[in-house]
Amino acid sequence: MKTIASIAELRAALAEHRRAGRTIGLVPTMGYLHVGHMELVRRARGENDVVVASIFVNPLQFGPNEDLAKYPRDLARDEKMLTEGGVDFLFAPGVADMYPQPMEAVVDLPKLGSELEGSVRPGHFAGVATVVTKLFNIVQPDRAYFGEKDFQQLQIIRRMVEDLAQPVTVVGVPTVREADGLACSSRNVYLTADERRAAAIVPKGLDEAERLIGSGVTDAAAVEKGVTEFLSNEPLARPEVVALRDPLTLEPVSEIGEKPVLLLLFVRFGTTKLLDNRVIAPKSARFAKVA
């Protein structure tokens, strides 16, 4: 694996492969990799001739009260993991490489980006969409890989690609989980031992929603209330968002009919906010074709 910081150098290296007709897969990350990231790499490695991973802690997606400096970083460890995963190129630019001057051009999806996490992190998804667009412009991948754990981010990127006719296929990869069901996340390292034990309640909240919907509850507010109460039984858990949404548009759902619904959870443990989600097919939808 070759580590490159320069945009020009990466473009030159990839141009040779592109001329040879090789497909390129991109795995964008902010580093401090875990097994979830490596599942993205595994998928990319199996579906492309050339795999590029990027590590860039993007200042545009951090708000004024979010500590960019404290975001965990360990480039040597990440390089070792990516090498073992079969990555061909690691693009690891500095801020001066990506943003040599203050950014005037911003990619913003104001409707999708102001919902849910965007409502409490204004500008966050504009920062994400802008840096992902810039990475797409630099790498020009055939496919790009993102985890389904950050479902809102994934849908924003999909819509951005569609609206801007960007020539890349966005591949969503199912969430990788730890032994107790907690979604793998770089944020998990911030949890204390007690908070980590308590965090096992989060995936159980998804199970509770599935149980309620499977039992015939069709009122979305009742499901959201039931899951909130379930999560609140854990003293260290502070549910911030328990929301049933349309999986494609992220618009609120009031009644659960035959279409699948998306449950999004944002639960805080101390200073750490954990995200999780599940697309749930109502019982009537699951068995509609059995006849």
Swiss-Prot record:
It is an enzyme of class 6 (ligase). The active site is at residue 37. GO terms for biological process: pantothenate biosynthetic process. The keyword ATP-binding applies. GO terms for cellular component: cytosol. It is found in: Cytoplasm. Keywords: ATP-binding, Cytoplasm, Ligase, Nucleotide-binding, Pantothenate biosynthesis. Homodimer. HAMAP family: PanC (MF_00158). PANTHER family: CYTIDYLATE KINASE/PANTOATE-BETA-ALANINE LIGASE (PTHR21299), PANTOATE--BETA-ALANINE LIGASE (PTHR21299:SF1). This is Pantothenate synthetase. It comes from Sinorhizobium fredii (strain NBRC 101917 / NGR234).
